[in-house]
């Protein structure tokens, strides 16, 4: 898979993982595990990129005597998810056309 495409997919997956509630690194990895395997280093690179792009915010809170970073999706992050859905609806339409053409030639 193209590196840029994979990056975009992973960014949206991380945004989707925090869409309904604030979350922290380990929980994001755990929530995504049934769908995609993600290392901690990759996740934190993505989180930093999304924060820089104003798609999420970060707050620090104490949990069990330790500081933990919690991530919250922003309006811009929600917009990215909606844009992604629209893009993929178009891609699926093209895919169906290609598959139809293949099956017509069989």
What are these model-predicted stretches?
Residues 17, 52-53:
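Short, motif-level signal for alpha-helix interfacial/capping segments enriched in acidic residues
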Residues 53-67, 72:
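Beta-hairpin "wing" of winged helix-turn-helix
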Residues 47-49:
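Short, hydrophobic-biased segments on the C-terminal half of alpha helices
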Residues 82-106:
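Amphipathic alpha-helical dimerization/coiled-coil segments
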Residues 2-42:
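N-terminal helix-turn-helix DNA-binding core of bacterial DNA-binding proteins
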């Amino acid at each position: 898979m193209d590196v840029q495409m994979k990056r975009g997919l992973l960014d949206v997956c991380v945004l989707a993982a925090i869409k309904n509630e604030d979350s922290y690194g380990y929980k994001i990895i755990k929530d995504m595990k049934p769908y995609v395997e993600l290392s901690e280093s990759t996740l934190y690179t993505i989180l930093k990129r999304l924060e820089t792009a104003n798609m999420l915010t970060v707050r620090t809170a104490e949990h069990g005597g330790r500081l933990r970073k919690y991530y919250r999706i922003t309006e811009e992050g929600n917009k990215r998810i909606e844009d992604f859905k629209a893009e993929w609806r178009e891609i699926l339409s093209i895919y169906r056309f290609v598959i139809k053409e293949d099956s017509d030639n069989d």
